[in-house]
């Protein structure tokens, strides 16, 4: 290697990127007998530019993929683009450009950016979810799910984003705002299609146990809470005669669900959600005065965020229920804190033992009756006591502990036919209808004769029309002059297409399985079974924790649905999950609005992709937040220059030199030990901890140790190994130097030599009467007599003139001398 050569990152990186892609070095092999690793980072939305969060995500995945390739695994490491979605329509309005053109121009640009970072993605399996072929199979799944009863249509109160003019699933509402645009969400009644995810609620919950130790505990807990399983008693509260008559006999009562049936004697009111059917009936009746109706309507008009932020509020509805055990009248209120979509939208309120009920009762002067004695035997009347204890003031269950009391009440209700034991879930079916253009059309036809009819599969894909006008007002497909008009696939009569498109989370709920299918079969089938059975499930999935109850839950649901439809084999899509932390600058998440964005292109142009990758993986463990640091980027660049300069001193070799370790001097032995320590660290990092920063630090220490000695063979061996260890992290410079020195023969599985960890000498402490007085170095195989003699010599001034009563040698650690006098 020329002594005057300089590290030219741009030249080297362009060269190797062309070689890798020309040779197809990142394509998975078709040999399904090989051990495999499927490494997948969450694919990006094609917004136009990648950001540092992408760089971090894909640097982690790429390091893993490269490590496993050179360690004899067949590796699938694909990338694609989650390319449907609202931003394309917003761009169409703002820039007067078609969403399709905007999207695919962005994809082309982002592909170049990803390539410029040297990521080892499969070219042949790259896809965009807006491709018609992808839409075809997604529509096919929809039809099969419809036929299996896993899709249904209904009108319901939905989350509506006024800004994006579309419906949102519960999971897409964050603190009362749209997850995408951040604007407030309101409630509207709207017809739409729903995936029956609740049919899989129990399995989704139970299978989380199989992910323990493989997924972050926080993600598992978030999904458990979102699914929200609770068991209790469902029973009917009956209206008293006067209230029933006032409602015109339309209702005799309604169902209530409680997880604390033991507190039933403490009920002082019943609370309904503002959307409850009884409340709606009262709004159109003469029972309530105009003031009460106006207040209820004001609550209805509040967004979920406003209701949660508000003080407890409500309206007495001028009707009463009858207590199922005492037959006493119980007032019925509408309350702003009751959710319409949990249980039946009605609760029995027990103020003494539920804090929300307590706050409401305190505000409106409703009775607060204690029916559970705390275990410590005294009440705190300033708040609700929700703890378990002993039932009191409850004739049927006085003296029973809470668990026994709950069981006794449930048995009483079931025996008398008053109610039943049920399990409820907070999880709600997934509303997938979106009133936008740039999405996968729902393959349904509305026929005046046949009703709702799924499209014939041979007509798929139902493609989007190109000749649309995006104004931001209403649904472009519904306004299209011809696209929606068709023939009924069942009777041939004139019919109308469904003009809603699918939630874009549908696309990201199965893309991982599409990647796992041999791309040569993509035209003929959704999944090639042989290929999918080999590659699935994903061995390592990488992405942000913000997807814990959106994408990750939906993907698990889709995996189970596709399994039950016969497409897939596994119960879970992702065997292991790594959630990387955010990239911060000045302590805040990078964003254009904060003016603290670092453009990856700027870093690549100035320092090179390897510097960017090295900094990203060295600055912090992947699970932690990463604080951008310009001086640390400079430091990463300096290290790569040191690596380049070291290469000028290395002799060319295609094999590791044979070294007699025993014949080496102290510095040479130390250098070999540091190199093999780094090799050990590499195996630990890639297979267990993902703490790439510790591996990089170990390589830096090893390079320093090599520089501190001048044995050519030790240098050659050490550099041979260090380039191997760094290749997954800084692949361009590692390949360039390896080709020059070792013809890339070092990029293979390396064995650890245990002999280098055997120390020739050991350090021993010497204590006199328990106090440390000295430390000395001695041959590791020295006899005990030699050890004791040397120890006594090292503390001569502490034992001079004194009698040694006892000599204690703890091998390899210390010598303790007990003296007197």
From Swiss-Prot:
Enzyme Commission numbers on file: 6.1.1.4
Main localization (coarse): cytoplasm
Keyword field contains Phosphoprotein: no
Keyword Cytoplasm: yes
Chain coiled-coil ranges: none
Motif window: 'HIGH' region: 44-54
Top-tier EC class: ligase
A GO BP entry: leucyl-tRNA aminoacylation
GO cellular component: cytosol
Annotated motif 'KMSKS' region, positions: 589-593
Single GO MF descriptor: leucine-tRNA ligase activity
Location(s), subcellular: Cytoplasm
Domain of life: Bacteria
Catalytically driven reaction(s): tRNA(Leu) + L-leucine + ATP = L-leucyl-tRNA(Leu) + AMP + diphosphate
Pfam families named in the record: Anticodon_1, tRNA-synt_1_2, tRNA-synt_1g
UniProt keyword annotations, A-Z: Aminoacyl-tRNA synthetase, ATP-binding, Cytoplasm, Ligase, Nucleotide-binding, Protein biosynthesis
Binding positions for ATP per the UniProt entry: 592
Similarity section: Belongs to the class-I aminoacyl-tRNA synthetase family.
Protein name per its UniProtKB record: Leucine--tRNA ligase
Organism in which the protein naturally occurs: Campylobacter curvus (strain 525.92)
Lineage of producing organism: Bacteria, Pseudomonadati, Campylobacterota, Epsilonproteobacteria, Campylobacterales
Gene name for this UniProt entry: leuS
């Amino acid at each position: 290697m020329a002594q005057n050569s300089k590290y030219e990152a741009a030249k080297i990186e362009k060269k190797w990127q062309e070689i890798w892609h020309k040779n197809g070095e990142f394509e998975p092999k078709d040999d399904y007998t090989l051990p495999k690793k499927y490494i997948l980072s969450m694919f990006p939305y094609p917004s136009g530019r990648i950001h540092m969060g992408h760089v971090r995500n894909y640097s982690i995945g790429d390091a893993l993929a490269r490590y496993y390739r050179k360690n004899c695994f067949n590796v699938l490491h694909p990338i694609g683009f989650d390319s449907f979605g609202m931003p394309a329509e917003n761009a169409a309005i703002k820039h007067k450009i078609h969403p399709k053109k905007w999207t695919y121009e962005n994809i082309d640009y982002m592909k170049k950016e990803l390539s410029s970072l040297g990521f080892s993605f499969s070219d042949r399996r790259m896809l965009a979810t807006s491709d018609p072929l992808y839409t075809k199979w997604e529509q096919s799944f929809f039809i099969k799910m419809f036929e299996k009863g896993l899709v249904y249509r209904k009108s319901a109160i939905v989350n509506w984003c006024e800004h994006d003019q579309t419906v949102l699933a519960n999971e897409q509402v964050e603190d009362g705002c749209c997850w995408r645009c951040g604007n407030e969400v309101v409630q509207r009644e709207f017809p739409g299609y729903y995936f029956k995810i609740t049919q899989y609620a129990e399995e989704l919950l139970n299978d989380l146990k199989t992910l323990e130790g493989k997924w972050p505990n926080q993600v598992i807990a978030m999904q458990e809470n979102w699914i929200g399983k609770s068991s209790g008693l469902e029973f009917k509260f009956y209206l008293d005669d006067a209230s029933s008559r006032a409602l015109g006999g339309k209702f005799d009562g309604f169902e209530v669900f409680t997880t604390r049936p033991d507190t039933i004697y403490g009920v002082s009111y019943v609370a309904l959600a503002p959307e409850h059917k009884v409340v709606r009936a009262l709004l159109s009746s003469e029972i309530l005065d105009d003031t009460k109706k106006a207040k209820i309507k004001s609550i209805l008009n509040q967004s979920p965020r406003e209701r949660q932020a508000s003080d407890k509020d409500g309206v007495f509805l001028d009707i009463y229920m009858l207590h199922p055990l005492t037959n006493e009248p119980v007032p019925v209120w509408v309350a702003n804190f009751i959710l319409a979509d949990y249980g039946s939208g009605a609760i029995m309120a027990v103020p003494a033992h539920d804090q929300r009920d307590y706050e409401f009762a305190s505000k409106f002067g409703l009775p607060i009756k204690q029916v559970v004695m705390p275990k410590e035997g005294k009440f705190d009347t300033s708040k609700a006591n929700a703890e378990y204890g002993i039932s009191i003031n409850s004739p049927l269950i006085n003296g029973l502990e809470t668990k026994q009391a709950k069981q006794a009440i449930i048995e009483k209700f079931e025996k008398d036919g008053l109610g039943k034991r049920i399990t409820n879930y907070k999880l709600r079916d997934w509303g997938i209808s979106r009133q936008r253009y740039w999405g996968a059309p729902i393959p349904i036809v509305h026929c005046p004769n046949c009703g709702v009819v799924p499209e014939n599969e041979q007509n798929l894909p139902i493609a989007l029309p190109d000749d649309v006008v995006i104004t931001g007002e209403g649904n472009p497909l519904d306004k299209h002059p011809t696209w929606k008009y068709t023939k009924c696939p069942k009777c041939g009569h004139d019919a109308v297409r469904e003009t809603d498109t699918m939630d874009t989370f549908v696309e990201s709920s199965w893309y991982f399985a599409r990647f796992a299918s041999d791309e040569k079969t993509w035209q003929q089938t959704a999944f090639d079974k042989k290929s999918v059975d080999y590659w699935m499930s994903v061995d390592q999935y990488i992405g942000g924790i913000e997807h814990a109850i959106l994408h990750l839950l939906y993907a698990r649901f889709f995996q189970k649905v596709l399994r039950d439809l016969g497409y897939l084999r596994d119960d879970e899509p992702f065997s292991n999950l790594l959630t990387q932390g955010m990239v911060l600058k000045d302590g805040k998440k990078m964003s254009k609005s904060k003016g603290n964005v670092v453009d990856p292109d700027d870093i690549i142009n100035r320092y090179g992709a390897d510097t960017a990758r090295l900094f990203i993986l060295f600055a912090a463990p992947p699970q932690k937040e990463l604080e951008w640091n310009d001086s640390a980027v400079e430091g990463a660049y300096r290290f790569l220059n040191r690596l380049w300069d070291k290469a000028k001193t290395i002799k060319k070799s295609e094999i590791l030199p044979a070294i007699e370790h025993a014949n080496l001097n102290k510095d040479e032995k130390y250098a070999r030990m540091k190199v093999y320590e780094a090799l050990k660290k590499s195996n630990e990092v890639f297979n267990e901890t993902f703490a790439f920063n510790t591996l990089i630090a170990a390589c830096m220490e090893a390079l320093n140790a090599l520089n501190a000695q001048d044995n050519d063979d030790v240098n050659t061996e050490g550099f041979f190994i260090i380039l191997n260890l760094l290749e997954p992290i800084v692949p361009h410079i590692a390949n360039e130097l390896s080709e020059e020195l070792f013809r890339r023969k070092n990029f293979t599985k390396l064995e650890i030599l245990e002999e280098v960890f055997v120390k020739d000498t050991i350090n021993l402490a010497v204590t006199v009467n328990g106090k440390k007085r000295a430390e000395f170095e001695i041959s590791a195989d020295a006899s005990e007599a030699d050890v004791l003699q040397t120890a006594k010599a090292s503390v001569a001034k502490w034992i001079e003139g004194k009698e040694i009563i006892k000599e204690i040698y703890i091998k390899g650690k210390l010598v303790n001398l007990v003296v007197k006098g």
